[in-house]
Amino acid sequence: MTTHKAMTRVQLEAMGEVFAVDNLTRMGLRGLHCNWRCRYGECDVIASETAHRTVVSRLRSIAATVMEGSRRSAPEQKVRWLRWLAGLWPANQDEF
């Protein structure tokens, strides 16, 4: 009999970040930063396609049998907050 251990929340989040970075890389983006934190919050993955376009993401890895879509975990207020937080990132980078 085979028993399967459930992943911990930390393991699931780490797997989600690897999956996201792999997908962004396949789309032609290059990773700039993972798990960037400031006093106001955290961005999980920051990637760039060009010098003028940067993708900032806050990941939510959910273990479920049915996915209800990304809007379930990203209400408009959270999207606005992430956009604001993304604007803080370049000011905190020496090379950007």
UniProtKB/Swiss-Prot annotation:
GO terms for molecular function: nucleic acid binding. Pfam families: UPF0102. It comes from Mycobacterium leprae (strain TN). This is UPF0102 protein ML1607. InterPro entries: tRNA_endonuc-like_dom_sf, UPF0102_YraN-like. Belongs to the UPF0102 family.
